[in-house]
Every structure is written in structure tokens, then in C-alpha cells.
């Protein structure tokens, strides 16, 4: 139902994302039925954001210059009431990334945060083993998502072998993930953009089903993609 709604609206979705995944993200959103834009200049954002249904801030390509861009984009989005998704790439990998992410969370309006377990744990002062953008799997992902939702005060999505969605002090688990996903770069980054495309459809009465729809759909797609690009094509 929500996929049909999205496709009928063809929502403009602005993605300020990392250099590695821009083409992958744009094509993924086009396949979904959204209209992607990779705008990276404040004056351009001022023109586009009034017509935008969702904004993604992905901190993968992090510099002092992109940090200023994130802040400008969030300020403009808040002015026009555009909901925002934050993907705090490798927030637990070092002090600089954590500082930038916490600055965005504490001084700007973020509608939803999506990350792996290590990234989300870092945002609430907890520690999970990480290596760059990759995070160790944990058994209690739902409990972590719930703690993050309670501390940050916004919906939290943790993705991995098990996905957890925490909203309004409640949590749901989706077991659609795959251990193969880390073998294909950019799948989590694309999901952040997918959530940004869907976010305008979410309201208090339908929050759970809205997020279950894109996450479940995306998990089924990327499971097949990961398997096709890894296991099936490996030589004997």
C-alpha cells in the first residue's frame, strides 16, 4: 500500500550522501519510484527543499566543509518543515565523527536516525566493536534501539542481520537481514535514502506499518543482491 502511495507521488528526495554510493543511491530511489536529487550547495537547497518530501544526511564523506553543508541543509529543511533522516556513518570509529554526529543531533531537528548497532551505540555513549563503517552483530539489537529512542527522543532504526525499529518507547524486530550484506558496499546507505523517501508518509497512527514496508521490501531486495554478487559468483 505505501509503496503504491510513494510511486503515485514520486517524491523529491534530497540525498547529501557519501561519494562512494551516490550513483547507487540515485538508481535505487529511481527504481523505488522516488525522484532523487544530490544537491550540495546551500543556495540550490534553498530552491529545492520547499518541494522536497525528505532529506537524507549521510556523514560518510566527512570533512569540515561537508559538516557546514549538513548544518546549512538541516537549517533550511527545518525552515520548510522537511523531515530528515540522519545516517551517522562510522560514528563509533573515532572522536571527530562522533563529535559531528552529536552536534547535528543536538542542535538541529532530526526526524529519524538509521545506523548499524555500533553507530547507534556510539550516539548514546555505549560501545560495540567496530571497524570503520562495519559493526559487530549483537543479540539484543531491540534493547539497544529502545535505549537510543528513549535517550535521543526520535525514532531509531538499527539495521543488520536483525533490524530494529524503535518509536515512542516501543520496539519491533524484523528478521529479514543477511550476514552477506556487509559484503556489498552501500546497502545501508541506500536504505537511509529509502527511509527519507518514505518518511513523509509516516504519522503517529501508521508509524510502524510505514517503516515495516520499506525496510522489509529493501531487505528482501538486498538479500538477493548480496547473494547474487557474492556466493553465487564465487569460484569453486
Swiss-Prot record:
GO terms for biological process: thiamine biosynthetic process; thiamine diphosphate biosynthetic process. Transmembrane segments: none annotated. Substrate binds at residues 38, 186. Its cofactor is Mg(2+). It is an enzyme of class 2 (transferase). One of its GO terms (molecular function) is ATP binding. CDD domains: THZ_kinase. ATP binds at residues 114, 159. Keywords: ATP-binding, Kinase, Magnesium, Metal-binding, Nucleotide-binding, Thiamine biosynthesis, Transferase. Pfam families: HK (PF02110). Pathway: Cofactor biosynthesis; thiamine diphosphate biosynthesis; 4-methyl-5-(2-phosphoethyl)-thiazole from 5-(2-hydroxyethyl)-4-methylthiazole: step 1/1. It catalyses: 5-(2-hydroxyethyl)-4-methylthiazole + ATP = 4-methyl-5-(2-phosphooxyethyl)-thiazole + ADP + H(+). Its EC number is 2.7.1.50. Belongs to the Thz kinase family. NCBIfam families: PRK09355.1. HAMAP family: Thz_kinase. Catalyzes the phosphorylation of the hydroxyl group of 4-methyl-5-beta-hydroxyethylthiazole (THZ). This is Hydroxyethylthiazole kinase. The gene is thiM.
